[in-house]
A protein has these predicted regions:
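Gly/Ala-rich beta-loop-alpha elbow adjacent to hydrolase catalytic centers
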Residues: 65-69, 73
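Flexible "cap/lid" loop of the alpha/beta hydrolase fold
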Residues: 74, 78, 85-118
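Conserved loop-alpha-helix segment in the C-terminal half of the alpha/beta-hydrolase fold
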Residues: 179-215
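Conserved HGGG/HGGXW glycine-rich cap/lid loop of the alpha/beta-hydrolase fold
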Residues: 1-32, 198
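Conserved acidic catalytic loop of the alpha/beta-hydrolase fold
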Residues: 43-61
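Residue in the alpha/beta-hydrolase core beta-strand immediately N-terminal to the catalytic nucleophile
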Residues: 26, 62, 85-88
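Short beta-strand immediately N-terminal to the catalytic nucleophile in serine-hydrolase-like folds
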Residues: 45, 63-65, 90
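Conserved alpha/beta-hydrolase catalytic His-Asp/Glu region
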Residues: 98-100, 117-175
Length: 217
């Protein structure tokens, strides 16, 4: 997820590491993958992930992406058709342009100043409280956000919005050509995620599961 690092999946890694071969990363500009020049596209980010998986000998991955990680997974499937064994979307949304209104697309391109204008303490609290329902989820996000300076955090948010707008505006196919499940927290309050997921499920004939007592993370 945007601004979150590999610690977002600590509990999932703990649950599945004895059964599955897992790889969790710090995306460019996140966690230990810093400093990083934030001028890349979503397609370039997918290419870097592909190179990492290839280097690790992982040739048919099941991609599990939360929020912006779900967008990245769709870009990966678009760029490397037939290579992905499965896709689990966690509180993400479709990259296909047809699902986003013109107003929403305009807002995506102009969201950065909203975050830059907020006091840093308020911004940190909003990042934690806005995405998590449980104390664990909120504290986990607080710890991940604490590693950034205000400028770093706002820079990540700005680049994330620009990157997504570029990928959506490219209006590529972004067809899900592998087994897929959509997961969405019943209490997700981030953007229009709760509205997009039923549309995505119906439009692409994908199964959607609502997760009880869960927010965005």
């Amino acid at each position: 997820g945007l601004t979150a690092d590999h610690r977002l999946f600590d509990k999932q890694v703990e649950a599945f590491e004895s059964t599955y071969n897992l790889l969790a990363w710090d995306a460019p500009g996140h966690g230990k993958s810093r400093p990083f020049v934030m001028d890349f596209t979503l397609a370039q980010k997918a290419a870097w992930l592909h190179a990492i998986l290839q280097a690790e000998g992982i040739t048919a991955p099941v991609l599990v992406g939360q929020s912006v990680g779900g967008y990245l997974s769709q870009a990966y499937i678009q760029a490397y058709p037939g290579e992905v064994r499965g896709f689990v979307s966690i509180d993400s949304a479709p990259l296909k342009r047809k699902y986003m209104s013109d107003k929403e697309f305009w807002m995506l391109n102009h969201m950065a100043p909203v975050y830059s204008a907020m006091p840093w303490k308020m911004l940190r609290n909003a990042a934690a409280q806005g995405i998590g329902i449980t104390e664990y989820a909120q504290q986990n996000m607080r710890e991940m956000v604490a590693q950034y300076s205000r400028d770093e955090f706002c820079g990540l948010m700005k680049h994330g919005f620009i990157m997504l707008a570029g990928a959506i505006g490219a209006d590529l196919g972004y067809d899900i050509t592998c087994p897929c499940i959509l997961l969405c927290g019943e209490h997700d309050k981030t953007g229009a995620t709760k509205r997009y997921n039923p549309m995505w499920a119906a439009g692409e004939h994908l199964p959607l599961t609502w997760v009880k007592d869960a927010g965005h993370n």
